[in-house]
Each structure stands twice: as structure tokens, then as C-alpha cells.
Amino acid sequence: MIGVVLAGGKSSRFGGEKLLYKINGKPLILHTIERVLNAKKIEEIVIVTSKEKMKSFEKLGFSVVVDKLKIGPIGGVYTAISHFADVFVVAGDMPLINPKFVDWIVEKFHESNTLVCVPKWKNGYLEPLHAAYSQDFLEMIKRQIEKGEYMLGKAIRASSPCYIKIESLPLEWQESLFNINAKSDLKKIKGALQV
């Protein structure tokens, strides 16, 4: 399966391009990419980003695809599945992603034969940027975008997805879902990331 790393966000709360911010000498996004590549079910990595950021991310040595829609995560997922078959999508700011958890989600996705397999919190909140998507989900997203509705969660819920109950997962897998929004979040992860 292709691992797609979304890198199109504005980083407004971070105060600069957070995905290129160096942690232990490596850009934040590279920590995420390396962990996803350690998953046995992931064959290659593709970065989906805006045209403006494309050159910065190409320097990392991975394939880059431009998200021309610029409508947030739903546009990134649409771009990914319009270029590739089934994909595992992750946000570039999730450096604690656990490779075994990625493999487990991909297995559940294949077993469930659904369009999407997504982690879900007890309160109903979804983690759509840590999920597996079928290329067959493209039409559902396309219809929603054409209606001017850009909430990825709405399209996922309408697809009768495979849900993964987050609270029942091992703690280290739950930590996979932690993302960096502000510089203060860096303190929480520096010890967990190896040089």
C-alpha cells in the first residue's frame, strides 16, 4: 500500500513551517515518514502538498504530488486516491506514529472490505489523517466537494467505514495519534524521538 503524508497545512499556530522544523537534527515530517516506512504493509511514501511548498518537500527525496484543490484534508485525501489505488494517509505532523499500528489498520482495512478504515474515539471524533482509504471512496468525496462540503468526517461516516475503537488500543498505539500544533507540543515528543 502507498503511504501518503499530507503536508499542505498552514502551520499558523506553530508560527512557521512546522513540518520542516528540525527535531534532533531532522525535519518533523521526516520523523513521521521514517516511522510509516517501517510499517511492513507500506511500500512507498508520497507527500501531498501545495504547489507553493512542493520544492521544499521534494528536497527530502520522496515523490511529491500537488493538491490543487486547497480545501483542507478532504482535498489531500481526494488528491491521494485520485493518483493511487488504496492508500494509508497520515498527517505530516504525527511523529509518534507506530508502524505496527499502521500495519494493523491496513490489515483491518483489507479484512473489512470497506471504503475507509478509521480510528474513532468514544465521543465519536474520528482520526481521518491516520486511516486507510480505498480508491473507490473517490466518488463519494467528489460528490461532497461538488456540493461545497469539505468535512472529511462527513464523507467517511456516510461510507459505512470500518471503525477502530481507540480506547481499546494499546497506549503506544494511541500515542500514534498525537500531532504537533504548537511549539509547546515539541516538549512532549523530543524524548520519544531518536536522533
UniProtKB/Swiss-Prot annotation:
Keyword Ion transport assigned: no
Pfam (any one): NTP_transf_3
The protein's role, per its UniProt record: Transfers a GMP moiety from GTP to Mo-molybdopterin (Mo-MPT) cofactor (Moco or molybdenum cofactor) to form Mo-molybdopterin guanine dinucleotide (Mo-MGD) cofactor.
Cofactor(s) the record lists: Mg(2+)
Protein name: Probable molybdenum cofactor guanylyltransferase
Principal subcellular localisation of the protein: cytoplasm
Gene behind this protein: mobA
Domain notes: The N-terminal domain determines nucleotide recognition and specific binding, while the C-terminal domain determines the specific binding to the target protein.
GO terms (BP aspect): Mo-molybdopterin cofactor biosynthetic process
Family indicated by similarity: Belongs to the MobA family.
Top EC class of this enzyme: transferase
Origin species: Thermococcus sibiricus (strain DSM 12597 / MM 739)
Subcellular localization: Cytoplasm
EC number: 2.7.7.77
SUPFAM superfamilies, A to Z: Nucleotide-diphospho-sugar transferases
GO cellular component: cytoplasm
Record-listed Mg(2+) binding positions: D93
